[in-house]
Design a protein with these regions (language model features):
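Acidic, serine/threonine- and glycine-rich low-complexity intrinsically disordered segments
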Residues: 209-417, 422
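C-terminal motif of bacterial Sec signal peptides marking the signal peptidase cleavage site
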Residues: 18-21
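Conserved blade-ending motifs and adjacent loop-strand segments that build the rim/top face
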Residues: 384-397, 429-453, 486-500
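Short, solvent-exposed loop/turn segments at conserved positions within beta-propeller repeat blades
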Residues: 143-147, 196-197, 206-209, 218, ...
Length: 508
């Protein structure tokens, strides 16, 4: 035992001297390693596709000579950019200023590694490799002869704003041998399912073939087309998407004659959903938000007629419906700040046209939400509903209702004005937003930023038509802030008569 103890003690003493040598430890304490301080002018770097990136935004402090390593890649699936995890990382440069030309459009995680021989520091950036039409507002419009155009109001980067670069492009639709005619609706989709990515910017028309153009989301180049001619109708409005199975992802739409159709994002073909039990008056995204930081929004197709509301969440489940006997449906709104995706249905009594109520259902739709009340000393479950009476309702079935991810209120259109509605009370009696005199509201949209976006959805876009406006184009765009209904920007006389507006968010 004594021999073992002496050997162990000697080993400990030798290890202590070795550690002092390795880590510059002296009897008086540790020697401080040469630190590195990294400062950057911005946490976001923008560069155009095919243009060499020469980055001069670094300010680095180090007492010793330093080396650089730049690497980039997609953010790992299921994580946020703030977690700094890569799906796959590629080292691209050892130059202080990067000096690299990117060949792929998208938004990436960029990592800088700085080493001075004693210390290592990391700095992470958001890298946007831009195609020119990466993010902004797209407006589909038609002139008096049905000639269509796709106007794009670009969301400029700070660098582009400083340079005074062009923001409004009156028509970016350019397909060899094709003319855009009688445009009706727009939709943007981006989803990865079972390892397969489906994306596209869809343009629906009422031309002689009922053409649906499937454009590349990053460049607006034509990917493929589908024709509705053989169905005897055309796409009137898009609304909702989901995966049918592991090899199929589709966007849904209402045809002009009230049928439900599906456009396959992979095969580019159109098919009718034949189990729809009624002719559809309206269809829209049942867009919901999960509370998880990395969760995706889900945009199931919701649709309704005067009597029944329906939702389709999967091919196996089919169409689920609900109705209220003795009541007509006026309109439907979705509260998107809830993880439970509550659907609010506004009803009007068939027997008393001044009597209204709002009922609530989850995204399963098959049952109304309930609450427990004390009645005559007993606990009784009753449906959640919000009744009210009015002879002057400021809403009808033509009102377009929009929610967003940061407010429980929704916006909706009525009588050429825009109102707010809390969904749990009577709709507003006074407009929240009035457009300038002469402007006729054609469509509204929010800046929904995709299935994996943050909660920065804070804008309302309104497109209008003014037949008395001078100049070639009589269509305009007005941008309002959701929090206080304030007008933040206007772009007047930039398009023809608008049919649809949509926020074209950035897609990787």
């Amino acid at each position: 035992m004594k021999r073992t103890y002496l050997i162990s003690a000697l080993t400990f003493i030798l290890a202590a001297f070795m550690l002092q040598g390795c880590y510059k430890v002296s009897p008086h304490g540790y020697t401080e390693l040469a630190p590195i301080t990294i400062n950057a002018s911005s946490d976001t770097i923008n560069v155009n596709l095919g243009t060499e990136l020469v980055y001069n935004g670094l300010d680095i402090v180090s007492s010793k000579e330093i080396s650089f390593q730049w690497a980039y890649g997609q953010v790992k699936t299921g994580t946020t950019p703030e977690q700094h995890q890569f799906e796959k990382m590629e080292v691209i440069s050892t130059s202080r200023t990067i000096d690299y030309t990117f060949s792929k459009v998208g938004s990436f995680l960029l990592r800088l590694r700085v080493d001075n021989g004693e210390s290592i520091e990391f700095k992470y950036f958001t890298l946007n490799v831009n195609s020119g039409y990466d993010e902004g507002i797209a407006i589909l419009s038609n002139d008096e002869n049905g000639n269509g155009s796709l106007t794009f109001v670009k969301t400029l980067t700070a660098e582009e704003t400083a340079k005074g670069e062009q923001q409004v492009f009156t028509n970016i639709f350019s397909v060899d041998g094709k003319a855009l005619k009688n445009g009706t609706s727009l939709y943007i989709s981006d989803n990865t399912y079972s390892g397969i990515t489906y994306s596209g910017f869809l343009i629906a028309t009422n031309d002689e073939d009922g053409t649906i153009y499937h454009m590349d989301c990053k460049t607006f180049e034509l990917y493929m087309t589908a024709k509705m001619k053989d169905t005897g109708t055309y796409c009137a409005e898009f609304g909702g998407e989901y995966a049918e199975d592991k090899a199929s992802f589709g966007c849904f739409f209402r045809s002009a004659d009230g049928r439900l159709f599906r456009y396959d994002m992979n095969g580019g073909f159109v098919s009718e959903i034949t189990d729809a039990p009624f002719k559809i008056d309206r269809i829209f995204d049942g867009t919901t938000k999960s509370t998880a930081a990395t969760a995706k929004s889900t945009r199931y197709p919701l649709f309704y007629d005067q009597n029944t509301i329906g939702i389709r969440k999967s091919a196996s489940a089919g169409i689920r419906t609900n109705a209220e006997e003795g009541w007509d449906i006026v309109n439907v709104g979705v509260q998107r700040v809830s993880s439970n995706a509550y659907i609010h249905v506004l009803f009007r009594s068939k027997s008393d046209p001044t009597s209204y109520k709002t009922k609530v259902a989850s995204s399963s739709l098959t049952q109304w939400a309930t609450k427990t009340e004390e009645i005559d000393g007993e606990s009784v479950k009753t449906d959640v509903e919000y009744p009210f009476a009015t002879s002057n309702l400021k809403m009808d079935s033509h009102s377009k209702i929009l929610g967003n991810r940061i407010s429980s209120d929704v916006y909706y259109t009525y009588d050429n004005a825009i109102y707010r509605w809390s969904l749990t009370s009577a709709p507003g009696s006074k407009p929240a937003i009035k457009l300038p005199a002469g402007e006729q509201i054609r469509d509204i949209a929010t800046n929904f930023k995709g299935r994996k976006a943050s909660d920065g959805e804070d804008k309302l876009y309104v497109v209008t038509y003014n037949p008395s406006r001078s100049g070639e184009h009589k269509g305009s765009l007005y941008v309002y802030r959701y929090s206080d209904d304030t007008l933040t920007a206007s772009y007047e006389g930039i398009c023809d008569d608008p049919a649809c507006v949509i926020y074209k968010y950035r897609i990787n």
